[in-house]
């Protein structure tokens, strides 16, 4: 990950620390992320199936590249416990 233009941060949440740790280990082991930060105790408020939900979750912050983003999307879709996992991609300007 030497070219900063290629580096991105991808964010998703997991319903528990166990699920988040498993996702982080899978992503790093599969080399689709260089590093993953886990932020436990994130509260998410969202609408799902007509109801407003208020849940504690774990925020995952993946450091990866544009080249590996699709493989990371596939991994999180396959291994996240959420029915529709969120995965946001953000460019890195400096770091």
What is each stretch, according to the model?
Residues 1-95:
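Positively charged, small/polar-rich N-terminal and surface patches that mediate targeting and assembly
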């Amino acid at each position: 990950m030497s070219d900063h233009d290629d580096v991105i941060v991808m964010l998703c949440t997991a319903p528990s620390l166990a699920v988040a740790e498993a996702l982080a280990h899978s992503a790093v082991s599969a080399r689709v992320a260089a590093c993953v930060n886990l932020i436990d105790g994130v509260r998410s408020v969202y609408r799902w199936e007509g109801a407003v939900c208020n849940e504690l979750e774990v925020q995952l912050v993946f450091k990866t590249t544009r080249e590996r983003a699709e493989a990371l999307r596939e991994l999180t879709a396959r291994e996240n416990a959420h029915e529709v996992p969120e995965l946001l991609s953000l460019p890195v300007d400096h770091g």
